[in-house]
Amino acid sequence: ARLVLEEFDENPFLPDFYKDPERYGFQTQLFFLLQRYRQQQELRQVDMFQKLLLTDYMFVKDRLFASLNLNEKEMYLYDKVANLLEKNVIKPDLVIYLQADTDTLMKNISLRGRDMEKDIASEYIDALNQVYTEYFFRYQDTPLLIINTSNIDFVKNSKDLDEIINFIRQPITGKKFFNPLSN
C-alpha cells in the first residue's frame, strides 16, 4: 500500500495560528487546502504497483477546521476556492473515522508532544470533535466505518490493532460502527 500523510509540518503558518488563531486562521487553512489539493493531484498519477492507497485525512478535513477558524468573509472566499478544487479530488473507497471523546483526544495530543500544540484549548478540540461528529452523522458519499477509540490504544497495544484490522477486513457497505473494548 502507498501511504500518504498530512504534511502539517510544512505549513509555515501553523505555529503562528496556535498563538493567534484569528490573525493566522485564513493563511493556515488556505495553505492546508492547497497542500491537500497538490497531494490529491499527485495521487491521480496511476501507480501500477500500488493497488492500495491509504491517507490519514480526507480532502474535506480542512473545510471542517475552516468552519471553526474563519470568520464569515474568510469562509466565503475559502469556500469559493475549495469548491473549484474539490471537483478534481479522488473519492475514497472507504472512510475510517477514528472517533474519541475530547479527554482522549487531549491525552493523545499531549502524548505526541508537538511543541506548537502544547497550549491547545480543550474547548477548541471539543468544538472540532462536534464538527466531525455532525459531519459523519450526515456522511453518505462512500462506505464509512466509525471506530470508537476512546477505550483502546491501537498504537501501543497490538491486540487492539489486530481487532481493528480484523474488523476492517470484513466487507463494509453503508455506515458501520465498531466499538472495541480495551484488551
Where are these regions (language model features)?
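Conserved substrate/cofactor phosphate-moiety recognition/catalytic segment
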Residues: 1-35
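Hydrophobic/aromatic beta-strand patches that form the interior of the parallel beta-sheet core
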Residues: 4, 55, 94-96, 145-147
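NTP-dependent small-molecule kinase module
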Residues: 110-118, 126-183
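Conserved nucleotide-binding/hydrolysis micro-motifs of P-loop NTPases
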Residues: 8-11, 59-61, 100-105, 151-154
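Short aromatic-enriched loop/helix-cap "lid" or pocket-rim segments at secondary-structure transitions
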Residues: 14-17, 66, 107-110, 158-160
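A glycine- and Lys/Arg-enriched "phosphate-lid" helix/loop adjacent to the NTP-binding pocket
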Residues: 62-133
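Glycine-rich phosphate-binding loop used to anchor ATP phosphates in small-molecule kinases
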Residues: 24-90
